[in-house]
């Protein structure tokens, strides 16, 4: 790690917010809920099958998605696909919420880390298989060990370096997408 980078944890960088499900107390609001089923195999958000349910208006006010939020699968997964899959929400704020099988990481200080950089950072950790060490399994359901997940070290370069890293990653992914389409 370069000397100019700093090290912190997810719990210091982000607010973690648990998801919700159907409401019990009126007034209700009918909203779209992002679920594990909306995570694509390439870690994107699939809008084609969003579940719309009635949730408590007061709860939705505290648990709606904001542009730049990271949605983390905390329950579900499988032996081949551990929990911890993360997607970046790049949509309008206040439109959707997220299910009780997920949680959101919301960056506390945008002058510290870019949400896209953190998304790619967590994706790299996931792809290396490190999430397997941060899960438990009971009756076939895999659960993220939140304390381990939120305590993992995050190495942070300057914002300008983060922007350069994100740009390089996205250039590579664009090239790969073009290659895949041409096959």
What are these model-derived regions, one by one?
Residues 1-20, 151, 155-167, 171-183:
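Non-catalytic DNA-recognition/assembly elements of restriction-modification systems
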Residues 11-23, 37-70, 77-80:
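Sequence-specific dsDNA recognition surfaces
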Residues 23-30, 49, 133-135, 181:
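Short coil/turn segments at secondary-structure boundaries
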Residues 35, 60-123, 145-146:
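A short beta-sheet element
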Residues 95-103, 131, 135-156:
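A short glycine-rich beta-alpha junction/loop motif
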């Amino acid at each position: 790690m370069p000397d100019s980078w700093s090290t912190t944890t997810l719990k210091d960088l982000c607010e973690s917010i648990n998801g919700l499900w159907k409401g019990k107390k009126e007034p209700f609001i009918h909203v779209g809920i992002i679920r594990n089923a909306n995570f694509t195999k390439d870690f994107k958000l699939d809008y084609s099958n969003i579940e719309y349910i009635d949730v408590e208006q007061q709860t939705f006010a505290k648990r709606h998605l904001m542009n730049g939020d990271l949605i983390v699968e905390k329950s579900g997964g499988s032996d081949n696909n551990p929990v911890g899959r993360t997607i970046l929400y790049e949509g309008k704020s206040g439109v959707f919420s997220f299910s009780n099988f997920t949680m959101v990481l919301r960056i506390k200080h945008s002058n510290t880390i870019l949400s896209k950089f953190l998304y790619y950072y967590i994706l790299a950790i996931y792809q290396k298989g490190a999430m397997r060490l941060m899960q438990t399994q009971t009756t076939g359901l895999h659960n993220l060990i939140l304390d381990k997940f939120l305590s993992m070290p995050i190495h942070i370069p300057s914002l300008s370096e983060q922007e350069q890293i994100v740009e390089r990653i996205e250039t590579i992914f664009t090239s790969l997408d073009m290659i895949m389409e041409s096959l």
